[in-house]
Amino acid sequence: NRNYVRSVQITMAESFGVRSRGAFYEQTGTIRDVVQNHLLQVAACIALDAPARGDSYREQSARLLRAVVPIDRDSVVRGQYRGYRNEPGVAPDSRVETFAAVRFFIDSWRWAGVPFYLRAGKALATTATEVWVAMRCPPRAVFGERIVDPCNYVRFRLGPDVTTAIGIRSKVLGERMSGEPIELVPTSRRGTRLRPYTRLLE
């Protein structure tokens, strides 16, 4: 909740372009394609209160999404990768976004003041979908040093490999009382990569 979480970042990056979906993308863009449905659903999974029963998940998710504060223009960044206008089915003067970043807040006691960031784009440096929950810095420095970012975090890699990781500061070796950032990876599931909708259905 807001007492411990500084921000939540949800990223869906793809290293490839629109491929043969140029005409489709001209009608949708990144926001309508993945942000307003897939990434918002992931945000709901992270932020909703635990449902009392399995069948009340949808109700809790809808309640949380209704609490999202209306997003203003200054909280959205849109971009288009170089070469998109040369893709088959794409207008030569297209202004459709292939990258979008959105910041929003949830109007609830639990999440008041905590920014949620959604990012998605094509033709980026890597392909990965992950959730990064940044924790608030502790009130005092354990190692007697100025607390610097990043503080502790929890990272969920949703694809293509499934990984859960925790980022912390650990004491460096030796007598010196100072810390260094390390990442603990308690769970890592690698193997057959499922297509996105196959993973959803299974």
Predicted regions, residues:
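Secretory/organelle targeting and membrane-embedding segments
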Residues: 1-202
